[in-house]
């Protein structure tokens, strides 16, 4: 049994007949390539978002997608989210502007606008089957010139700390923030999740100094150790989260 990817336009799809000459939709579950959750950030030349705002928006977008009813058992996104979350929770952050970013609004996902940043998280799939509109967006070198400031603490929200020991681009930092938020969601009690939801899935991202990081490592409730696909060595502790 094969499951078709969620239709990004929301329209009804049908299985081609034997006389239909249109190309068959590839079965994502038959791919041998790694799966990833793609994220896209808006990066307009005239109004570039701050580094920390992108990280906070990305983390919230990840959680919004994971808590969407369509990601729950029985939902149309569930087979894809479950398959991906059962393995390495890889995330790929892309950037685009203008019409390039507008076009990806039609793809299934969850979007967050926060403090001048706009980030959309997409239903996971194999890295060799990224929708064309999304595949056109740039991946490497996503680094914002302005760091910005962490958002104010929000009751029920979480704090994510990024390591000061290893340099990371904005794209990498946003992915790590998303990992930390996802792990936090999985570690929370039901009551803690409800409080977080009431906060609007608020995420505050901070960049501690080395001493503060060492203390946070001892007290944080979750820690992210990166797989080492890009920028950092495998096993690097890249982010922490607490609430």
Spans of model-derived segments:
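Positively charged, small/polar-rich N-terminal and surface patches that mediate targeting and assembly
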Residues: 1-203, 208-211, 216-217, 221-243
């Amino acid at each position: 049994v094969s499951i078709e990817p969620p239709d990004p336009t929301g329209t009804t799809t049908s299985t081609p007949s034997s006389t239909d000459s249109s190309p068959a939709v590839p079965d994502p579950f038959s791919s041998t390539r790694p799966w990833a959750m793609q994220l896209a950030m808006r990066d307009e030349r005239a109004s570039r978002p701050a580094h920390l705002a992108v990280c906070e928006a990305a983390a919230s977008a990840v959680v919004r997608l994971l808590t969407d009813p369509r990601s729950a058992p029985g939902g149309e996104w569930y087979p894809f989210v479950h398959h991906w979350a059962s393995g390495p929770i890889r995330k790929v952050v892309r950037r685009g502007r203008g019409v390039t970013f507008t076009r990806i609004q039609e793809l299934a996902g969850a979007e967050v606008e926060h403090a001048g940043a706009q980030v959309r998280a997409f239903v996971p799939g194999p890295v060799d089957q990224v929708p064309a509109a999304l595949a056109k967006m740039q991946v490497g070198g996503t680094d914002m010139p302005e760091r910005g400031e962490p958002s104010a603490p929000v009751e029920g929200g979480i704090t994510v700390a990024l390591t000061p020991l290893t340099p990371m681009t904005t794209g990498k930092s946003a992915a790590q923030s998303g990992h930390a938020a996802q792990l936090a969601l999985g570690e929370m009690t039901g009551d803690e999740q409800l409080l977080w939801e009431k906060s609007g899935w608020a995420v505050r991202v901070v960049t501690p100094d080395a001493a503060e990081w060492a203390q946070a490592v001892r007290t944080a409730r979750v820690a992210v150790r990166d797989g080492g696909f890009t920028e950092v060595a495998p096993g690097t502790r890249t982010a922490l989260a607490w609430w």
